[in-house]
Amino acid sequence: FFKQKTAYEIKECDWSSDVCSSDLRKELDIDIENVARYMVFADEAPLVDTVTGSSTFQKTFPQRGPRDAQGRSLRDYDLKTRLFQYPLSYMIYSDVFDALPKPVQDRVYARLVDILSGKEKSGEYAKLDPAAEKAALQIVAATKKNLPEAWLAAAR
């Protein structure tokens, strides 16, 4: 993502001003949409049968992530109809995500809020379960610092 843009261009980009060229905004918006699609597993194929296993990884992987007061984590498996229980990647906690330039990160957060709050229900986003979407918003609101107010409001 963001491969042809310079760090300076992205850092200085402000969607509400002329500092960011319209071409750069268009390119970034495409990349931001791709990141959001990835993060909500929009292209995930449904499981046709229950996945079972007894590996150590299957038991320890969910324990690596933060949990909210209800004991929920983005790393919790479903393994019946989909891989994870909640439609949001645990990569939201990654250093890579946190290192995104602020204008880009703000836009990714905004897209995720639109998708997970149910505001965006077109195409591939229509298949997402509203209860699981709300839970994902709540889990992140309880376990990640420095979230935008729109995220916190959508999680309530």
Name each model-derived stretch.
Residues 1-19:
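Single conserved hydrophobic/aromatic residue that forms the stacking wall/gate
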Residues 23-156:
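A cross-kingdom marker for long, charged
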